[in-house]
A protein has these predicted regions:
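Sec-dependent bacterial lipoprotein signal peptides
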Residues: 1-16
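N-terminal leader/targeting segments and the immediate start of mature chains
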Residues: 16-67, 80
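Short, exposed beta-strand/loop patches in secreted or surface proteins that constitute
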Residues: 33-35, 60-66, 86-88, 126-134, ...
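Extended beta-sheet lipid-handling architectures
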Residues: 42-45, 57, 88-90, 167-172, ...
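Gly/Pro-enriched, hydrophobic low-complexity segments
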Residues: 72-74, 127-187
Length: 187
């Protein structure tokens, strides 16, 4: 299980190294506006979910719709489950599979399925509270707070040239997953 220290270090980066915090916040809000105006995005997400004593890694091809808040996905890797497709609704509790269903251990105190993580990302980018925005010299890092009270997820997203390239998702001070993002496109 990941310790709380990485969150504190990331926050130190956000607070300490950005020479123009206003510019970083403007970049975060410009990304949100572009995403919402486009109506959605597509991306590949390589997810490493932390289950405490072990991790699982899988890759999804994703399509997030800002209007409905739903995410369509197709498993790209590992090959043994490649091709499984489904939809994650906005409540993250309803996952509809096209044919074969996946069963994975839940994250965030048994409240979040790993295949729902990209939906959390899309929802955060499109409308969650932007708590911090800063720079670590090569990337703009934005911290979103997704949810309320006991159900709040912290979503850190690293942007390069205006597109998300990595995200980490935290619940109650504990890392739940890291997500490498590629092939990001607005549609």
């Amino acid at each position: 299980m990941f310790a709380v220290l990485p969150v504190l270090l990331a926050l130190a980066v956000l607070l300490g190294s950005c020479t123009a915090p206003t510019a970083c916040m403007e970049e975060a809000t410009a990304f949100r506006a572009a995403l919402c105006n486009a109506g959605g995005c597509s991306f590949q997400a390589e997810i490493t979910a932390d289950h405490g004593d072990y991790t699982t890694t899988f890759t999804l091809q994703c399509r997030y719709d800002t209007q409905s808040g739903a995410l369509d996905f197709t498993v790209a890797a590992p090959e043994s489950i490649s091709g499984i497709a489904g939809t994650v609704d906005t409540d993250r509790k309803t996952i509809t599979f096209a044919a074969t269903a996946l069963e994975t251990p839940l994250l965030a105190a048994e409240k979040l399925a790993p295949v729902a993580l990209p939906q959390v990302l899309g929802e955060s980018w499109a409308g969650s509270y932007i708590a911090q925005a800063g720079s670590d010299h090569a990337y703009t890092v934005v911290l979103y707070q997704n949810g309320y009270e006991d159900d709040t997820l912290q979503v850190e997203t690293w942007f390069s040239e205006g597109a998300p390239v990595y995200a980490s998702i935290w619940y109650d001070g504990v890392s739940q997953a890291g997500v490498k993002l590629s092939d990001f496109q607005l549609y």
